[in-house]
Structures are given as C-alpha cells and as structure tokens.
C-alpha cells in the first residue's frame, strides 16, 4: 500500500448493524473517505465490537461485517491507498480501551449524550456496561493509531472531545505518549434526509424504513420509495430547505448521484411538476446503485479477494496499533 509522503493520519469507521448502508452513508461519510484517501494515511474500520452493545445474531454479524467491507470497496475505498480492516481482528483496540477507561472520569462518561438518550429508551436493566463505555472504546480506536485527524459528524463530536481529554490526561502523567487528535471538517458533502421526514437526517434509527434508500435494496423498491417521498402542497420546484425540505432533499439526492449542480437541475424543471422530479430522481438513484450492487455481489459471491484485503488491513493496523499499546504499557510499568 502506498502512503502519500508527509500525509496526516485519519481514522473512521461504520458499524455493521444492517445488511446495507443507506444513501446518506454513501454520499456522506464514505464519500468523504474516498476524497481523503489520496492525501492522507487513512485507516477505515468496520467497528464490529461497537455493534455488540446490543444483542446480535452471530451469523448475521459475520455476514454484515463482510458486506459492510464490500460496500466500502464498491463505493471507491481503495486498499492500495487506505487500510481497511475489521476492529475485532486487532487486539490493540480492547487492550487500550481498558487503560483509557482507567483515565476516564465516571462523571464525564455519564454525561455522554448518546448514552443518556439510549439508556433512557432502553431502561436501566437493558442498558449494558458496554454501552456506557462505548465512547472509551471509540477513544481507543482513534488513539491506537496515533490519529491526527478524525472526520466526525455532530453526533460524534462529544465522543471525540472525550478522546482528546483522555489523551491529554494520560499525557499529563506520561508526557508525549499519545497523539491528541483534531476534528477534521471535510469538504461539504451532500446531506441526505429521510424521504418521509425530510427535516431529519436519513438514519437507520428512524422509526420506519419507508424513508431510507438502502444501497443494496431492490432498485424497484428504492424507486417506489422515492415516488412516495413527502413533498408539499405547492407546485413549483425550487431549492429552499427551510420552506420546501422534501423537494430540496430530492434535488440534493439527484445532484449528488449525477454530479449535476442543483441550480442546473432547478432550471431544467421550469414548467414541470413533482412527478417529473421524483421520476428523474428515482432513475438517477437506480443508475447510481446498480454498479455498486454488482460489485458487492461479485465480492460476496467469492469472498477470497475481500478476505485477503481485510487480512492485509488487519496486519497493517496491528503493526501500527501494537506499537502504541507497547508504548502505553511501558509508561504504565507493565512487564513487556
């Protein structure tokens, strides 16, 4: 694998909690990764350890881990330019997480918004210690690789702040041990919203699947969802996310998958109605997902190539992260 000279290291990952990424993942996080891999030392991970904070069927988890990695490759992540691996195959993540947990205040961990929200929904009996310590494992994910930059959305910014705090706390006792990562604000990518609730981000946590465009769904189903997308009672097609969120979301989607500027799209719809917009957007999405689905099918039908990519990625990840763990263990006084 070639790494650009003088490039800064980045780390990011996605949980394998479903059989398909959705369009928001593809045009948001993964599109950012594709753009970053050329001029960064990039580590992209399938974070399966994080997935087990809720019960998982073992066979489903194995399948979803492989299919998530396959979608990384199909969307343009290049193992010749980035390290792609599965979290559980690199022991350094859990080794470092225990140490960092011993440098994380209970009060700070208790204030993590995602934990408070999820534990409130699940109730105390159903809430696991794993969910509570989830941000500490995230910190280990990042700090194990001497990561300099982390591309994060607003929902993960608090967790990155915890990682920074823990690294600084460790360094205050053992100077120069851990690299303190910075937030990376990538170039603007498309923000894709739920088709049925276009004021909310497209997300697997939505109450219904009707607003999601899953990359690996039957294209006919995706087209049907787009034709049923919420719009408004007006007739004119213009880009105005505040007043016309549904129409603006469809324009965003079509623009993102075709590379056509939104203003050009709007001009082309002069005198046309929402039916035309939905039809064209559906056709554009189907054209976008078809080659992705074909590549995923190819990789999963004969997984030798995919498994080789993940094995090579895990080895490189281990080579890097184990040095961090060894450095941390040495500073703490552990026998090596």
From Swiss-Prot:
A motif ('HIGH' region) lies at residues 16-25. Keywords: Aminoacyl-tRNA synthetase, ATP-binding, Cytoplasm, Ligase, Nucleotide-binding, Protein biosynthesis. GO terms for cellular component: cytosol; plasma membrane. It is found in: Cytoplasm. ATP binds at residues 15-17, 24-25, 153-155, 192, 201-205. One of its GO terms (molecular function) is tryptophan-tRNA ligase activity. It catalyses: tRNA(Trp) + L-tryptophan + ATP = L-tryptophyl-tRNA(Trp) + AMP + diphosphate + H(+). GO terms for biological process: tryptophanyl-tRNA aminoacylation. InterPro entries: aa-tRNA-synth_I_CS (IPR001412), aa-tRNA-synth_Ic (IPR002305), Rossmann-like_a/b/a_fold (IPR014729), Trp-tRNA-ligase (IPR002306), Trp-tRNA-ligase_bac-type (IPR024109), Trp-tRNA_synthetase (IPR050203). L-tryptophan binds at residue 141. Its main location: cytoplasm. A motif ('KMSKS' region) lies at residues 201-205. Its EC number is 6.1.1.2. Homodimer. Belongs to the class-I aminoacyl-tRNA synthetase family. NCBIfam families: trpS. HAMAP family: Trp_tRNA_synth_B. Catalyzes the attachment of tryptophan to tRNA(Trp). This is Tryptophan--tRNA ligase. It comes from Mycobacterium tuberculosis (strain ATCC 25618 / H37Rv). The gene is trpS.
